[in-house]
């Protein structure tokens, strides 16, 4: 594709848990090969404390970011736009430059009810699923695949459990 880092936008509804963890993971694991950002269609007031604690537990750099909306991001050039929740997939805006679109649907750990142990486990499980999917993305020979084949492979990553 290009010599510059691949630009990836992770979308969810609140931009408080899944998309924040995905952004942090890809920026950390991608080591300059990828530039990830995240946003939400209806951003929450703050990043979920369990998402922050999970990132910190795995020593993933997290720079005290706040949830943000999609406004303005739909005018930026993206190589990949990846939704991590069904609601974001349904309301995904049109992006210029025909980025590759993929849906990596997963349960929202912020909606899990129960005691603290149960909630922490839900965030850990979501983090580990995102980590596996990002590892699969990183293993793809992105520079060698034609666009259609690449888009199909990135979409298939969303089926990984």
Regions found by a protein language model. Name each.
Residues 80:
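Short, Asp-centered acidic motifs that coordinate Mg2+ and/or phosphate
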Residues 92-161:
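Phosphate-binding/catalytic loops
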């Amino acid at each position: 594709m290009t010599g510059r880092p691949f630009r990836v936008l992770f979308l969810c509804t609140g931009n408080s848990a899944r998309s924040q963890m995905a952004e942090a993971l890809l920026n950390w694991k991608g080591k300059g090969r990828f530039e990830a950002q995240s946003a939400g269609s209806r951003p929450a007031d703050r990043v979920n404390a369990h998402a922050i604690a999970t990132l910190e537990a795995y020593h993933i750099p997290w720079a005290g970011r706040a949830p943000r909306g999609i406004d303005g991001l739909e005018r930026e050039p993206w190589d990949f736009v990846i939704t991590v929740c069904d609601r974001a997939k349904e309301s995904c805006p049109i992006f210029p430059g025909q980025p590759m679109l993929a849906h990596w649907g997963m349960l929202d750990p912020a909606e899990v009810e129960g005691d603290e142990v149960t909630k922490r486990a839900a965030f850990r499980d979501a983090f580990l699923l995102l980590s596996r999917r990002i590892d699969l993305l990183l293993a793809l020979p992105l520079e060698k695949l034609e666009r259609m084949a690449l888009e199909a492979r990135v979409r298939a990553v969303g089926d990984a459990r």
